[in-house]
Structures are given as structure tokens and as C-alpha cells.
Amino acid sequence: MVYRRWMLSIALVALALVASGPGLHAQSAPVKLGLSAAVSGGSAASGEAIKRGLLIAIDEINAKGGVLGGRKLELVVRDDEGNPAKGVVIARELVEREQVAAVFGGLHTTVALAQVPVWHELKTPYMGTWAAGTNITRNGQKPNYAFRVSANDDYVDKFLARYATERLKRGKPGFLLENTAWGQSNEVGLTKWFGDQGVKAVGIEKFNWNDPDMSPQLLRLKNGGADLVVLVANAPEGAQVVKSRAKVGWAVPILSHWGISGGRFAELTGDLSDGVTFIQTYSFFGQQSARGQYVLKQLAEKFGVKGPEEVIAPVGTANAYDALHLVALAIEQAKSTDGAKVRDALEDLKGEYTGLIKAYRRPFTSDQHDALTDQDYIMVVWRGGKIVPVQ
């Protein structure tokens, strides 16, 4: 009799575990979110900045109970090295092996564009936090799985054209662009928006990644009469441009896209970087909102950042922080980690989220997958190796 009761107890316990085990596991398992970014090489600062913003937001949400009734968020980081082919492999790995609910993207437009077909095939939301290529979000897909809390080249080019002509009073720009899909995206936008101001570039020059000297391109722009160089480059090549400008003895002002802030630009150029002006979406200098103060405090406690002048690649952190919160809100609204449901929720987020960069009220729609526009950009300048707002 005792033996029978003992066996019956074991059977009942086993039955209970079988019946409730998967459900309990599903309820308590962390919700994984992926990051595909360059966390090594010349643009590693961008990847590190993005990772910091994501982790600060994740810790904040987890401290308040997580999502979906208590599930913690967990970040899975993969280094795409700015390599499109590796980015595609990573995209599949994050979704198929790691089973992430969404993926955040890094600095390189070339990588992001290569990954776009994968997100749509696997029905996984992508949230850009840096790469600005226009066609990342305007990709012609319906439904569209690519979203962004970052700059969009089309908006950036409009902003730069207006700043150059209205603020700097320059009417003879020369474009110096990297020879990639990102450079091509900006060539189209800059030509369009400067044209809208009644201005035509005196020359359009290209360079390849790792080119050691930009003197020939700069001399051609100088001889063409350029009174401003509009630069589209990441940190390694941007540094070569600034060094080459000094080499040819040309004191022309440089107005740049923000790629130069994603690496060791100031370290590689020293005082030569002073005065180079470029766009950002956020600055940790000046009076901060309560959320800005919180993020700075977390940067200090978690990463040893002593002040705004030590915040590396600040837009990476700011964009990623806001982007993570919007994705978490979408997961909560969808009541699911299913990619299609999260995507639908992103397009119809309820209420308002007061973020670091701005207050977001329905930041995405079926036709608009960029949460930020040119109304959200600011101009900054390199001074003494630090990024400070233009006065």
C-alpha cells in the first residue's frame, strides 16, 4: 500500500511538471533582443555606445519588472565588423539560433541594407540606431519590418543643405563621399536638397575605405572653387580627410554627416579636428531633462564616464536608449514576442513615451518608419577632442 501511494505521488508530480513546465518556462524565460554592430575595428566606439544605451534601458526596464508579466530583457551582442556578408550571417544566427524578438542595428548602412531582406524573410523587427541610409526604412517592403530611431540621409541632407546656405552662407559646396551605398544615398540627397536651395556642387569626389590620402580629391575641389567641403565619412576615412586638408594647406570649413563621431576621429587627428562641424540627434552638454540626468548617472556608475565630455559617440547611446524603450513598449502592447505582432504594435504605439531625445507620440505608422526627422537634429563641433554644441 505504501509503495502504491509512493508511486502515485511520483506520477502526479511528474504529470504536473509535464503539464505546467513549458508554460512556466515560457513565462519566466528572458526576452532576448539582438544587437548587430561594429564593436571592433575603426568604428568600435559606435558599437560600444549603442550597447551602453541598450543596456541602460534594459536594466531600467528589468528593475521595474521586465515585460510580459515579469520576463526580463536580455541583450545578445554580435560583432558584424562593418562587413555586410557577416551581417547577413549574424542576422540569421540571432533570429534562428538565439530566437531574439527584435534586432538593433549599428553604424554601417552597407550592413543594414544587406540585412533588410533577412528581417522580412524571418519576420523579425529591425530597429536602426545609427545607420542612416534612406533605403533602410524606405525599402519598398509591405509589410515593412525595418524601423529606425536615428537619422535618415534624406532628412540629414536637407538639414545640411539648409545649414550650409542659410547659416554658413556658403554657395559653392564640394561633396566628398565614401564610395559605398551610404555615400550614394547622400549624393542623391545632397544634390536634391542643395538644388532646392538653388545651389549646385562645384565637384563630387569619392574615396574608398582605408584610402591613406585624400589630397587629390581635395585639390580638385579646391581648384573647382569650393568654399565648403560637405563630408560623408566614418571616423577612419574622415581623419584622413582632415589630415589631407592640412597637408594641402587649405583652410576650407568642413560640414559633415555624423559618421566621424563613431570612432577614433579626434584621437587620430588631434587639433586638426577643431572646427569640424556635424549633425547629432542629442547632446549630453547643457541643461538635461530628468531622463538625461538619469542616463548620465548610469553612464557614470556602469561605465566610469565622468561627464558629458567623456560620453563616446553620444548619438549611439541616446538613439539606442530611446529605441529600446519603444521596442519594449511594442512587446507589451502586442502581449507577445511574435515578430509580426511586435511589428504591428510598433506601427500603432499607444500613448506617449517621453524619451531622451524627445517625446514620442505614435512615432511610426505604416508609411513612416523613422521616428526622428530633421526637426530633431542639432549641430555640434569638435573642440579640443570633445563634441560640443554649436553656439
Region locations from a protein language model:
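Extracytosolic ligand-binding ectodomains
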Residues: 2-17, 24-391
